Amino acid sequence: VGSEMCIRDRLCVPRYLPTTNKTHTLTSLGEMLLPVIEANKGRCFVLCTSYTMMRGLAEYFREKSMLSILVQGETSKGKLLEQFTYTSHSVLVATSSFWEGIDVRGDALSLVIIDKLPFTAPDDPLLKARIEDCKLQGGDPFNDIQIPEAVITLKQGVGRLIRGIRDRGVVIICDNRLVMRNYGETFLKSLPNSSRTRDLNKVIQFLQNQ
């Protein structure tokens, strides 16, 4: 069953991603992603690692697209999921609480976009305490704590798409670290087997042919 579920899916880490510490990142990312979302006629989750990115992308999509843009926080979680499932051509832009425990099956969801690897913010008090404890025990906090936790969270995000044997689609992860850093392979190995590309035009062609 696992192989049948996975073989139909595509994973894309786009080329030419905007530099993450630039003020124009949000607009550039919106410009890059909107043609893909429109090629898929919505049916998309955009999972963000910050509220700033969530609100910014939602605003951009609403300004530039005729698709129905649903945003976490504007109504209850249950209502948002109901609207997403039963409203054609919907895009749900959300953050942490939508990374797990969500079950949307079939054609309603066929594209999941993740803005970057979901590392916990370094100023998180609980993470700070765990890092300090790890250091005291002679450990490596990044490899022992931060990477494993982010891997689990990413798997949950990708799992929004692959829920049943008939589900298929595309996952786009907008983070060059997946292919530029040594630890990127750890993340990739944790995900379901799928064909991979860095070419968004190929993704658009794939979605238009579905």
Task: Report the location of each language-model feature.
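ASCE RecA-like P-loop NTPase motor cores
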Residues: S3-E4, R8-Q210
